[in-house]
A protein has these predicted regions:
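N-terminal glycine-rich anion-binding loop in soluble enzyme alpha/beta folds
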Residues: 3-68
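Short, ordered loop/turn segments at secondary-structure junctions
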Residues: 9-10, 29, 88, 120-122
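Glycine-rich phosphate/diphosphate-binding loops that line cofactor/substrate pockets in enzymes
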Residues: 71-83
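Short, acidic/small-residue loops that bind anionic groups at enzyme active sites
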Residues: 103-124
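Short Gly/Thr/Asp-enriched flexible loops that form oxyanion-binding sites at enzyme active sites
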Residues: 87-109, 129-131
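Short glycine-rich or small-residue beta-strand-to-loop segments that form or flank ligand, phosphate
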Residues: 82-90, 116-119, 133
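Conserved N-terminal glycine/acidic-rich loop preference
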Residues: 124-135
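Conserved small/polar residues in nucleotide/adenosyl-binding loops
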Residues: 137-139
């Protein structure tokens, strides 16, 4: 079986994530020193976030690290599943590159499994739409 992964930048509604059995790796962000995790299960208040940005709040976003990818990928690999990760544009974030590096290391430990990490060259619903299309044809 193939397990699909993405990050929260795909901005997919939770109903579609569950319907298509997609695993979402969360981003973290900080607003004025307060760190939050933007996960698929969390209500992200985009209006408040961008209003804070416009008003000059100190905002930082965090790259998803290898540990978070490993934490998500390993249970699927151990269950005998291959993985396709569909990520945000490398022009915006290095997250897809980190996923690819993680994939390379994990395929050495699980040589019978395949992990493909894609940079979509898109973000938000552009990334999400690619993922949904893939979910319909990947089986």
């Amino acid at each position: 079986m193939i397990k699909l992964f993405t990050d929260t930048s795909a901005n997919l509604p939770i109903e579609l994530i569950h319907k298509h059995n997609i695993q979402v790796v969360p981003f973290e962000y900080t607003v004025d020193g307060v760190t939050a995790e933007y996960s698929a299960e969390t209500d992200f208040d985009g209006i408040a976030f961008y209003n804070a940005m416009r008003s000059g709040a100190d905002i930082k976003t965090c790259l998803i690290n290898m540990g978070k990818f490993t934490e998500g990928f390993v249970p699927e690999l151990e269950a005998g599943n291959d993985i396709i990760y569909v990520g945000m544009s490398g022009g915006i974030s290095s997250t897809a590159s980190v996923a690819a590096i993680t994939a390379g290391e994990l395929m050495e430990k699980y040589p019978q499994r395949r992990i493909l990490a894609f940079d979509t060259y898109a973000a938000s619903l552009g990334e999400g739409l690619m993922l949904l299309k893939l979910s319909l044809i990947h089986i």
